[in-house]
Amino acid sequence: MKFGKLLKRQIEQSLPEWRDKFVSYKELKRIVASISGSPADEAAFVAALAADIDKIDSFFLEQEEEFVIRHRELQEAIKKAAEAAAEVAGIRREIVDFHGEMVLLLSYSSINYIGVGKILKKHDKRTGGALAAPVAEAVRERRHFFKTETVSRMVRECEAMMAEAAVLPAEAAPEALAAAAEHGIFRNTVAALLTMEDVRRGSSTHGRHSLPPLTLPDSDWLRSFQPPSPIPIQ
C-alpha cells in the first residue's frame, strides 16, 4: 500500500483532535510536482515544509508536556487508591487510556518523521537538489518530535503501573484488562501500531541522509490484543 494511503489510515486511527496535526503529505507532494526550477517555487516549498515541521513539532511538545503532568497525577492517584477498592477500576481505565494515547503519540512522531523524509526524497529527485541532508540533520539536532525518550520511558512506566497489585489485583487482572481493551483508544492504539508495521515494511526512504527510524513500543502485553479493525473514536 502506498504511503499516502497508510498515512490516511493512521490519521483515521488517531484521536479526532489530532487529525489536522499530521504532515500535509498530499499538499507537499502537489507543491513538489509544481516546482519548475525557479527560486520562487523552491522558496514556496521550503516555506511550506518548514511550516509543517513547526506544526508537528509544536504539537508533539505540547502533548509531551501534558503527558508528563498526567503521568505524575496518575502516580499520585495510584498511591491514594491503593486502599480504596472502589477507585481502582476508574484508575485502571485511566492508565490504559493514558498508555494508549502515549503510544499514539509515538506512532504520530514516527509516521510524520517518515512522511517528511519521503517528501524530501521526492523534492531532491525532481529538482536534483540536496535538501534532504541538511533538513534531516536539523530535525535530529533541534526538533522535539525526533526525541521520543521521555514518552517512551513513560510508556514503560505506565505498563509497570498496570502490573502493580494495588491497581490490578492478581485475581481481577485478566478480566480488567480485557474490559479495558474494549475501549476505543486502546483498540485504535493497537491498530495504529499495526499500520506503522506496514509503513516500515514498505518504506524505501532509508539512506545516508534519510531520517533514522524511531523506536515504537514492543510490548507483549499491548500486542496480545489485536482487533481485526479499528473502531471510530467519536
Swiss-Prot record:
Please report what switches on or represses expression of this protein.
Answer: Up-regulated during cold stress.
One Pfam family it belongs to: SPX
Q: Which organism is it from?
A: Oryza sativa subsp. japonica (Rice)
Which residue range or ranges hold the SPX domain? 1-137
Region: Disordered, residue numbers: 202-234
Q: In which tissues is it expressed?
A: Predominantly expressed in roots and leaves.
Protein name (record): SPX domain-containing protein 6
GO terms in the biological process aspect are: cellular response to cold; cellular response to phosphate starvation
| Listed InterPro entries | SPX_dom (IPR004331), SPX_prot (IPR031142)
Describe its function.
May be involved in maintaining cellular Pi homeostasis when plants are exposed to an external change in Pi.
